[in-house]
Amino acid sequence: MASGKKLIDQLCSVVSSFLCPSISSLDIDRCAVGPHIFSRGSSQAICTVKLLHGEVYNLEFVYRYWAHILEKYNFPFSPTFIICNNGLAVTLKCYVSEPRDLSSRYGQATSMALDVNLQRNSFVVLSQDDFIKFKTPLVFAKDLDITNSMVVCRTYLTSSRNSLQFLVVKSKNPRRLENVLDMIKRAVEATGSNLPATREKPLPLEQTEQLESTLPSSGHLRVLQSTSLTGRCPSWGAACALLLLSLAVGLMAILAAKLMQWP
């Protein structure tokens, strides 16, 4: 259970830090810790975020970050994000696997598109394949990787209409971005090797079997244009490890702050 709580803390921290850097404090509701939330097809979202009008949300980046964390825990499923409108609010629900009976829970399914009119009792499913399908007509095959392009969502939420605009943004300097990612990766790996007590352990998946049931760009971002897209004090070793961890966190915070800067 301790490793499960640690995983939930990590996933929610990614959402809070990187989903929408322009919002100082997200309206986020975390789930209660329990083994059932990691079961295949669980109906319990890890967290639910209320979306606001006129904001840009870094959906693919957060999704890819989640997938990376789950892979480190040897988790066998891919995360699923769902944007739904229940008539009272438009929310983003983040699951570690695709929940069952989506239609009965959230209503009418709507595909990801450049412009989505999210009517009451409708939802959009966001998975790894959905991001790739959306980007394929808009970028070259070599640019499909998250280090070269990513999907964001701009919200238009009013009393009369709830609309989502999915956009693809591309870094002006992919090489610099890759170098920064490598630097953060090395710092985090070094920290993990020096702090054995905090090393991550695979999650117990007995519940799963029973039920069978890496980044904000360091440069500016630009919207890719298309014919229909015009928007846009311990030992010395432990002390060194803590210093490296602080460096990694600081780098990610700086990158997150720059993510929403446009040319």
Curated annotation (Swiss-Prot):
It is found in: Host nucleus inner membrane. The chain crosses the membrane at residues 236-256. InterPro entries: Herpesvirus_viron_egress-type. Keywords: Host membrane, Host nucleus, Late protein, Membrane, Phosphoprotein, Transmembrane, Transmembrane helix. Its main location: host cell. It is a single-pass membrane protein. Phosphorylated. The keyword Cytoplasm does not apply. Residues 257-263 are nuclear. Pfam families: Herpes_U34. Residues 1-235 are perinuclear space. It comes from the Viruses. GO terms for cellular component: host cell nuclear inner membrane; membrane. The keyword Cell inner membrane does not apply. Forms a heterohexameric complex with NEC1. Plays an essential role in virion nuclear egress, the first step of virion release from infected cell. Within the host nucleus, NEC1 interacts with the newly formed capsid through the vertexes and directs it to the inner nuclear membrane by associating with NEC2. Induces the budding of the capsid at the inner nuclear membrane as well as its envelopment into the perinuclear space. This is Nuclear egress protein 2.
